[in-house]
Amino acid sequence: MATETRSQDGCWSCRLRKKKCDERRPICTECMCLGLECHGFGTRPAWMDRGARQKAQAAKMKQKLAQLTKNRRSKQARAQEDCAVKQPPNSHTEGPKVQTDVAAASNGMLIDHESCSLPQTFGGTSQDEFAKSQGAAGHEEEIQNTIVADPLVSSGDSGSPTMFDDMTFLNGYHVPLASSGNSGFQASLEEMDFLSEQNFDLPNLESILTGSMHMAPSTAVVGVADDDLCSEYLLPESQVCTAYPLNGTSSCMLPITDMEDAMLLAYYMEKVFNWQFPFCSTPASGLSQGCFLWLMSKSRPLYLASFALSSSHKSHQRALADPSSKLRYEDHAGRYDVAREEFHCNWKAPKAADEVSMLACIVSFITSSLIHGDKVDWTCQLRAGTSLIAPWVTQARPETNSSPLKSPEESSRDFFISSIIRIDILSAINQDSAPALSHNYKELFKSAHPKFSLEAVGGCHNWVFEALLDVYLLRDWKKKTRAAGLLSLWELTSKATTIQVDLEKKIASNVTLLRQSKEELEQQKGRPLQSDQCQYEIYVINHTFACAVSVLLEVIVSGAYPQLPEVKQKAGRALEALTDIKDARLLEVVGWPLFVVGCVVEEERQGFFRQLLSGQMRNSVSLGGLLDLLEECWQSRVSGEVKDDNFDFSHLRFHKSRNVLIM
């Protein structure tokens, strides 16, 4: 019996806890059901050392499980109290039955996802349904009894407690080369479900991966992850007692019920929107303030998620202006809870929810993690987002000049798909491997008329991200071959040279366009056209990101030696590009280059980053915490904790017990 619960080939979280893992990709069921971070199936984490760090990680995991259990029970109690208070006067005869149903559904919340679905009536629960919920509650209680045990100690076959034995080293997650086509994403897609209704086609996985499925422009196909994909989407117990109708996407007007909501809406449109989507004014953008407001009026989840983000952003700015005012997640937790509840209702709805609002909600939740990094798990949101965009990405067809104008829904959908693609690619810098959809992204970017344009989201052309994906894949190849003892320096250099030659050609071409654009602006004598100004800014962002990509490529090939001529030259060029940016609005979107270049510059050049991030950009929301991360990197290299020859940006994946988002 003991051997059935031991995991030698599962995710690292289950292996640490000695629990059986179903090895679901990209995240296993066990971790999602319990609300734990799944550390995946790649290379052995640094903390898995069979020593102090491993014990500390196990203790941290145990503490988190205990806290989750405590929070869940507190919510159950509050939910029952709220329901009792909110019952109408003529329902006193069915009161006990309502409370029983709430408790039963709550007890099964973390284990039986189907029990999360709201019944049509609460007073008519059958005995079979009640027994089922009680069974789920008993099963959940059994798991809780298991997880409170010390995760560092497990019972072997003999039943006696034993410490962790040696764990078989797992190779990194396989990222196929271009010749393998879409097969590399098989592991990530094989468990997906797809919602459907009258206006939605029901694709099968084989047709998606082989490219045989036809996607008409008027047909929306939404790929929805498995129920166990993300524990954050589990319906909270308080949902049963909500005072608002939970009909998913609504066609009604914005339900502004009080002055606070009206002020948050005004603040979002005035401050947050332009910060969140700084390049919406470009011709290629498919989103505007009016379009976003229209989307909010049709989608209650997006409306609530946007208000939660607006509330957090407003408090963040207030805390910066007034030292006595502190930014506390608890002050906004209620808004985020309700937003997630509504999001979950759309996610689990029998009708396919509006995919535009779902994508927009995910982008808003990920953006919120920049403010509440220790409370909002962006990795969970991103996994949900990539599962939603997978059918669109794998089946995307190049646009043609004769393509008809897109509807507002189509333009907005493409914009938010591009947003998730951008986040997925940039955030991989300090993760274990390249994005699972890397080869699909590359195919999109090669098109002369790509369906998804990333410049509309972050001001950076697709060719930069295509080069970055090549560098990521080279990094993964180097890790895999080195672990197998098969690394060929000649082959590594050859692959890197191919990438570098193509990248340098595009950098030179962009520099030419940058200079021409700058001359045109100067000829307009201080009153440039908005379109010309936007185009110039895009060339600036292109150059900055591309120079940072060249730095990353050099580090992968030669190591992170700041004094090495190749690294020094590439870092110096990137630093010059960063120095030329004076506009704080543009600096907000170059966090990724600041991180990459800042990690490998010489000691005498570190002052630029300290001065910028503690001076001009000290109040930045997007760059908050970046200086602390760089200081940690510099200190770890000075102390010898991290060696230059094996420097990997994944060393900086976690900071202050949170997974750092770089974008």
UniProtKB/Swiss-Prot annotation:
GO (cellular component) term, any one: nucleus
Keywords on record: DNA-binding, Metal-binding, Nucleus, Transcription, Transcription regulation, Zinc
DNA-binding residues (ranges): 11-38
Annotated signal sequence range: none
Region spans: Disordered: 71-97
Annotated InterPro entries: Fun_TF (IPR021858), Zn2-C6_fun-type_DNA-bd_sf (IPR036864), Zn2Cys6_DnaBD (IPR001138)
Matches recorded under SMART domains: GAL4 (SM00066)
Functional note: Transcription factor; part of the gene cluster that mediates the biosynthesis of the meroterpenoids arthripenoids.
Family recorded in the similarity comment: Belongs to the TRI10 transcription regulator family.
Protein name per UniProt: Transcription factor atnD
